[in-house]
Amino acid sequence: MVDSSPPERPDLYVVARMLERLWRENGPMLKTRLQTACNVNYDVFRKYLAWMLSKGLVSVQNCEDGHERVSLTPKGEESYRKLVQWISEVIQGRMPGQ
């Protein structure tokens, strides 16, 4: 599974890209496919995946075909919604409902 040490201070844009890609997929996603979709190298991906696992945002399933798939947990889905709302309000200056 994941044996990489998580980042001490994660880049929220990387976290947001990973959460968003998993949210849009609407189901488990192959690790390598998620890594390329997030446009980060594999070492960076492993660190962020370890961090997200430690926070309960994602889960990793070993599948019968020998591949590992990543999916959002309910906590990950809620975190994605909150992050999108925060970006809209703070970064883009939009209030909810606008």
Which positions does each model-derived feature cover?
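A short, conserved structural fragment
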Residues: 53-63
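Basic, amphipathic "hinge/linker" alpha-helix immediately C-terminal to the N-terminal HTH DNA-binding motif
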Residues: 66-80
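Soluble, non-transmembrane catalytic domains of enzymes that act on hydrophobic metabolites at membranes
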Residues: 8, 34, 55-57
